[in-house]
């Protein structure tokens, strides 16, 4: 065995063994590599960009960025509390909801304790859990989504957290409100359920179309249950680049999370953008409606080529390419399309495609057809 390095000896084993997060490629990186203009359909961003009101609000605070931001995010907390009919003390904004996942894990887990989620779910869950010294238990998928019965059966006396990405990233599947209701009745008092609703805006619209009840997450919080709902401004609101998200949960628990938050972590620019975005529902709705119209068209276009597409409740599609996803992604990038190969999720032939504008989706379908008609890429 190799001798441990000087600095490795200083770092706890669970940190030494920690795998980092690898994001989807930026347009700049992809364009430098491929030397072609690229459309990014990899990271589930809003293809219409941020609200003009959010842009104006961000510009207005730039001249004051020599001052620290409001550490308590008072205005944003108050606005979200009014919107969701909870107390301001129940709301904790962070620099994206992923930051709160790390805070939750560090607050509730220590070595010897565990968290539970599903296989092929949000890739930050294992990172946050391991960084806190905890163990992540992953149960098998059922029909490309969460098997809530399996998760309930996996709970033991050392379980403290259950992560439910609903809808799930990267498969795009959803568990209904009725299913979550039944599941919560099986969860013991020593476990906190994290309902990660990053894609809730799209799911709510699809659910209304399809006659399904999506989520009672905020009702659980209002009832005082051990549930924390996570949401973000990165998706429908188009603010992924400024990092703004939040959690809503029980007052006492959220107070611990607030203490764990890095000082001044939500910038003045992010707070201004988030507040303005909440005032421009029409902009978010434009993205949501475009997504609802385009999702079946894009899915059908891919399916007509003979590839399996999982029905989505989100702003992306999970597709089985039947070939090496990394090579498919590389060839699409050469054609000017950035998508996400899902090998890191344990799906070496699967790809994730953000649903774009009508024009972007047509460009993707043409490029995908051309790429997949080439010799097998296995």
Predicted regions and their residues:
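N-terminal "arm"/small-domain region of PLP-dependent enzymes with the aminotransferase-like
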Residues: 2-67
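Active-site pre-lysine segment of PLP-dependent enzymes
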Residues: 130, 148-158, 170-193, 197-236
């Amino acid at each position: 065995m190799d001798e441990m390095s000087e600095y490795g000896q200083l770092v706890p084993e669970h940190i030494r063994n920690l795998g980092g997060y690898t994001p989807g490629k930026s347009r700049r990186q992809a364009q430098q590599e491929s030397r072609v203009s690229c459309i990014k359909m990899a990271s589930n961003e809003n293809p219409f960009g941020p609200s003009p009101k959010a842009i104006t609000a961000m510009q207005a605070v730039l001249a004051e960025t020599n001052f620290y931001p409001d550490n308590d995010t008072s205005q944003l907390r108050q606005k979200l509390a009014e919107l969701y009919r909870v107390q301001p003390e129940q709301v904790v904004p962070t620099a994206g909801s992923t930051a709160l996942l790390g805070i939750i894990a560090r607050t509730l887990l220590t070595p010897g304790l565990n968290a539970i989620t599903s296989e092929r779910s949000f890739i930050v869950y294992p990172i946050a859990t391991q960084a806190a010294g905890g163990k992540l238990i992953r149960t098998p998928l059922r029909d490309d989504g969460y098997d809530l019965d399996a998760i309930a059966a996996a709970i033991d006396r050392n379980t403290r957290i259950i992560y439910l990405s609903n809808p799930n990233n990267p498969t795009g599947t959803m568990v209904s409100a009725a299913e979550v209701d039944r599941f919560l009745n099986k969860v013991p008092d020593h476990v906190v359920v994290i309902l990660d609703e990053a894609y809730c805006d799209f799911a709510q619209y699809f659910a209304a179309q399809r006659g399904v009840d999506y989520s009672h997450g905020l009702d659980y919080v209002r009832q005082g249950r051990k549930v924390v709902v996570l949401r973000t401004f990165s998706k429908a609101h188009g603010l992924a680049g400024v990092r703004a998200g939040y959690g809503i949960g029980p007052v006492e628990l959220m107070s611990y999370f607030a203490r764990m938050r890095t000082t001044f972590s939500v910038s003045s620019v992010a707070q201004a953008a988030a507040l303005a975005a909440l005032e421009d529902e029409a902009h978010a709705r434009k993205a949501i409606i475009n997504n609802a119209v385009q999702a079946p068209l894009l899915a059908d276009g891919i399916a007509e080529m003979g590839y399996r597409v999982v029905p989505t409740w989100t702003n992306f599609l999970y597709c089985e390419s039947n070939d090496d996803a990394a090579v498919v992604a590389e060839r699409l990038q050469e054609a000017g399309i950035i998508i996400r190969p899902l090998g890191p999720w344990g799906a070496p032939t699967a790809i994730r495609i953000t649903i774009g504008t009508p024009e972007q989706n047509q460009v993707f379908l043409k490029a995908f057809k051309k790429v997949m008609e080439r010799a097998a890429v296995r």
